[in-house]
């Protein structure tokens, strides 16, 4: 099968990892002819572009394809995408992220090519202006009429899009975002060795948070909970895994509270280090205020660690209270404090929740499960096209 994936940028992030693993799995496991089209990848978050271009993978960089809205560059991107897709003539076009999703779907539909789009997270949300919210909502409504199928990374994304009037329920299908599960099940290095490198003592309880240091990711909420947590349990250590523009301000905030010795920032780490860092931790906390389904939640469970998360978007599909972790109302700092303290003080509870999560979700989040489901969806779309049922919302 000839497939083209289009994504705005290949920074270190959940949507990008999903796209990269789809490309690799389709080419390596299924023998497909796969091309990845993306814009430039730059910034403190790090890039997956080098890995994407390894071996014989076909990667095309579209210089004008940028995240920020720029009418001239967006028009140029659309023209180039149309030209490249006309040249490549793929069986399926698969778009990801908002900008590439809108431009890519438009170009593919214009050429009559079968096209699907993955919703990794909603571009319209409660934390933006009304004008921006309405603009993104309209753009998604418009683009939904120019694709054959919408793939959600969790059921919550489907519910939000249907409620917003983007498309009817029968246009959506959920495919959980696959990942390489083995490094989480069996970390490449022993837990004790990694903890020693981090300067963590055997009695310390490490609370890990994996996310870009960026707005709405919830690092400030963890910091707000820390004084009460440490007053009750001074053995807790907070590990922030990731880089971003807020590292300086967050470190300053921690210093003002006199808590610098209790926090550690790893900075930018390659994805292959995340499993061993989670393995060296004792629980995973994720306080983001908007996500599709944060990959770190199943990753924490695959590592055998309980997870604490705000009840937003798809979190409740993997964070099951009393079974795999703690689900909290957003921005409820007292509840966040209590959840961290409960888990920090009960090793048996941590092990029970983590092992249950590992048992429930390992197969569901395997890369191979995702690529198999994607192929089934592609085939359904192609069959519908052959039968003259080009779907529109």
What are these regions (language model features)?
Residues 5-13, 17-73, 245-246:
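N-terminal strand-loop element at the rim of the active site
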Residues 16-24, 205-228, 245-251, 334:
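A conserved mid-protein helix/loop that constitutes part of the nucleotide-sugar donor-binding site
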Residues 81, 85, 268-269, 276-281:
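Short alpha-helical donor nucleotide-sugar binding micro-motif in glycosyltransferases
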Residues 146-172, 179-184:
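A short, active-site helix/loop in glycosyltransferases that binds the activated sugar's phosphate group
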Residues 289:
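Aromatic "clamp/platform" in nucleotide-sugar-dependent glycosyltransferases that forms part
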Residues 306-309, 319:
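Short hydrophobic beta-strand element within catalytic cores of glycosyltransferases
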Residues 321-322, 326-333, 342-347:
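Conserved acidic donor-binding segment of nucleotide-sugar-dependent glycosyltransferases
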């Amino acid at each position: 099968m000839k497939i083209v994936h289009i994504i705005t940028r290949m920074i270190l992030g959940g949507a990008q990892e999903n796209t990269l693993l789809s490309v690799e799995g389709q080419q390596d496991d299924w023998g497909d002819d796969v091309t990845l089209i993306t814009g430039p990848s730059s910034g403190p978050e790090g890039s997956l572009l080098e890995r994407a271009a390894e071996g014989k993978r076909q990667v095309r960089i579209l210089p004008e394809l940028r995240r920020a809205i720029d009418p001239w560059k967006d028009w140029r991107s659309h023209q180039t995408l149309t030209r490249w897709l006309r040249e490549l003539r793929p069986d399926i076009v698969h778009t990801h992220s908002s900008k590439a999703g809108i431009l890519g779907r438009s170009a593919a539909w214009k050429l009559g090519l079968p096209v699907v789009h993955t919703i990794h997270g909603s571009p319209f949300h409660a934390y933006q202006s009304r004008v921006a919210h309405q603009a993104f909502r309209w753009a998604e409504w418009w683009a939904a009429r120019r694709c054959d199928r919408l793939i959600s990374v969790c059921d919550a994304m489907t519910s939000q899009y249907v409620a917003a009037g983007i498309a009817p329920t029968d246009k959506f299908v959920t495919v959980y975002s696959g990942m390489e599960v083995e490094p989480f099940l069996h970390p490449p290095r022993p837990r004790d060795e990694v903890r020693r490198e981090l300067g963590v003592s055997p009695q310390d309880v490490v609370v890990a948070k994996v996310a870009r240091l960026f707005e709405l990711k919830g690092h400030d909420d963890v910091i707000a909970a820390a004084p009460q947590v440490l007053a009750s349990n001074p053995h807790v250590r907070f590990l922030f895994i990731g880089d971003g523009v807020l590292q300086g301000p967050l470190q300053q905030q921690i210093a003002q509270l006199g808590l610098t010795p209790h926090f550690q920032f790893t900075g930018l780490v390659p994805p292959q280090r995340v499993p061993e860092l989670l393995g060296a931790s004792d629980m995973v906390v994720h306080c983001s205020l908007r996500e599709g389904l944060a990959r770190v939640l199943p990753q924490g469970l695959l590592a055998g660690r309980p997870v604490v998360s705000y009840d937003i978007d798809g979190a409740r599909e993997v964070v099951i209270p009393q079974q795999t972790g703690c689900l909290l109302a957003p921005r409820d700092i007292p509840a966040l404090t209590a959840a961290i303290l409960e888990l920090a003080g009960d090793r048996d509870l941590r092990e029970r929740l983590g092992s249950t999560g590992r048992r429930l979700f390992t197969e569901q989040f395997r890369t191979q499960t995702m690529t198999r489901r994607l192929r089934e969806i592609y085939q359904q779309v192609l069959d519908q096209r052959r039968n003259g049922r080009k779907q529109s919302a």
